[in-house]
């Protein structure tokens, strides 16, 4: 399973960074390409904050916090037993997404976003991986944790 987790993390980081590179090299900041007019666009945007732009320009805080959370995730990878593979997959998605956005913050001080559904803040592949990982973790906690003897 370790190899699968490595692939999830690596694939998340690579897809995230390549997609951001393509957007940054082929579009100007603010450009928007309609994929489905008024529903889904590729829009080149930068976010110096967290989700929804909160705490903008707190780059050092985000870098330090992300590194600390990554260390916690590494600890959890080693601490969780084989029976918690679904939790490890959730953590791998979050880990890959966090590293993808961390690379941006270290390199530029902001995160490149481009998926634009017009009714929601613009986001990227790293954000999608983090949200998917958190969603899997919430599902596990709500519906599966009793089967594993958690929270007894």
Swiss-Prot record:
The active site is at 113, 127. This protein specifically catalyzes the removal of signal peptides from prolipoproteins. This is Lipoprotein signal peptidase. It is a multi-pass membrane protein. Its EC number is 3.4.23.36. The chain crosses the membrane at residues 3-23, 57-77, 83-103, 122-142. Pathway: Protein modification; lipoprotein biosynthesis (signal peptide cleavage). It comes from Natranaerobius thermophilus (strain ATCC BAA-1301 / DSM 18059 / JW/NM-WN-LF). GO terms for molecular function: aspartic-type endopeptidase activity. It is found in: Cell membrane. It is an enzyme of class 3 (hydrolase). The lineage of its organism: Bacteria, Bacillati, Bacillota, Clostridia, Natranaerobiales. It catalyses: Release of signal peptides from bacterial membrane prolipoproteins. Hydrolyzes -Xaa-Yaa-Zaa-|-(S,diacylglyceryl)Cys-, in which Xaa is hydrophobic (preferably Leu), and Yaa (Ala or Ser) and Zaa (Gly or Ala) have small, neutral side chains. Belongs to the peptidase A8 family. InterPro entries: Peptidase_A8. PANTHER family: LIPOPROTEIN SIGNAL PEPTIDASE (PTHR33695:SF1). One of its GO terms (cellular component) is plasma membrane. Keywords: Aspartyl protease, Cell membrane, Hydrolase, Membrane, Protease, Transmembrane, Transmembrane helix. Its main location: membrane. GO terms for biological process: proteolysis. Pfam families: Peptidase_A8 (PF01252).
């Amino acid at each position: 399973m370790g190899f699968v987790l490595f692939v999830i993390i690596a694939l998340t980081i690579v897809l995230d960074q390549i997609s951001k590179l393509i957007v940054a090299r082929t579009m100007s900041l603010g450009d928007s390409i309609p994929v489905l007019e008024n529903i889904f666009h590729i829009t080149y945007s930068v976010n110096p904050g967290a989700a929804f732009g909160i705490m903008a320009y707190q780059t050092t805080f985000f870098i330090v916090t992300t590194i600390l959370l990554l260390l916690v995730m590494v600890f959890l990878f080693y601490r969780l037993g084989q029976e918690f593979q679904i939790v490890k997959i959730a953590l791998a998605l979050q880990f890959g997404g966090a590293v993808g956005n961390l690379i941006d913050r270290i390199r530029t001080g902001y995160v490149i976003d481009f998926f634009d559904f017009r009714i929601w803040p613009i986001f990227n592949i790293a954000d999608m991986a983090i949200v998917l990982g958190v969603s899997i973790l919430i599902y596990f906690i709500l519906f599966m944790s009793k089967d594993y003897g958690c929270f007894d």
